[in-house]
Every structure is written in structure tokens, then in C-alpha cells.
Regions:
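Intrinsically disordered, glycine/charged-rich C-terminal tails and inter-domain linkers
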Residues: 1-8, 19-20, 26-143
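A short beta-strand-to-alpha-helix junction
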Residues: 11-15
Length: 143
């Protein structure tokens, strides 16, 4: 077979799961996303950032945005805010929505087109306003 067929064969669970989120990724401005199993193989050759995890059919996959797929200016802005973004994400996972919200706001001041940071910012706001209470899922794009 060809490379595409081999890739699909080797990573069929991940491919099936990611296919469900293609439109959400596009809407969030994510040009390329990979699971942790792929990112581990390519992280030394590419720039990327952890953006969260997805849950599907009993599986949980960590998701990385490949920043090399972005235009140069956008890529640089996301690289410049990567550490702040990941710290904000960790605060979100620790249910520190106030500090997480503040850091996501800082990320957006530097990189206003970061739709993933915007999504988490709004989710932090909802959690702070008790729309979700303690039952919030930390999964990316969960509704």
C-alpha cells in the first residue's frame, strides 16, 4: 500500500477518533493535530504544543497542535505563548479557573487568533460562574 494506508493501518483508533473532530479543529484554527503516540515520534523534528485531550469510545488521547503547519507569524506567536498556554491549561486541570482564566487572557492579548486559548477561557468563565459546577470535563471541545 501507500504511506497513507500504512499510517491509517498503524493508527486506526486515533485516525477514527480525530476524524470526528475535523470541523472543530478547523473552526479553532488548528491546521494539524496529532495524538501523543504520533507526537512522540516527531517532536524532535517539529514545533508543537499540547492543547488538551479528547475522549472517544472509551479511549483518551492527548492532542498536540503542530505549529509548523501555521503561517510563520502565527507560528511564532504560538511558540512565544506556548509556556504560558500550557501553564494556564495545567491550572484549568487543577480546577484553578480564576488563575487559568487570567493566563488564557494573557495568551490572547499576545495571540488574539488563538481559538483554543479562547475556548478554554470561555470554559474557565463558565466554571467560575458555576454553570458546570464540579462536573466539568477537561476534555477538549467537550460540550
Amino acid at each position: 500500500g501507500n504511506d497513507e494506508q500504512a499510517f491509517t493501518y498503524l493508527l486506526s483508533k486515533e485516525m477514527k477518533m480525530l476524524e470526528k473532530y475535523v470541523e472543530r479543529f478547523r473552526a479553532a484554527g488548528i491546521r494539524m493535530a496529532v495524538t501523543d503516540s504520533v507526537y512522540e515520534l516527531i517532536e524532535k523534528e517539529t514545533a508543537g504544543r499540547y492543547i488538551g485531550y479528547l475522549e472517544s469510545e472509551g479511549y483518551t488521547f492527548k492532542i498536540y497542535e503542530i505549529l509548523d503547519a501555521c503561517p510563520a507569524k502565527e507560528r511564532q506567536k504560538r511558540l512565544d505563548t506556548k509556556e504560558k498556554f500550557e501553564k494556564a491549561l495545567n491550572l484549568f486541570y487543577q480546577e484553578d479557573y480564576y488563575l487559568g482564566r487570567n493566563l488564557f487572557t494573557e495568551v490572547l492579548k499576545e495571540c488574539p487568533d488563538d481559538e483554543v486559548a479562547k475556548w478554554y477561557l470561555f470554559l474557565c468563565e463558565k466554571c467560575l460562574n458555576a454553570e458546570y459546577g464540579k462536573s466539568v470535563s477537561g476534555a477538549l471541545f467537550s460540550d
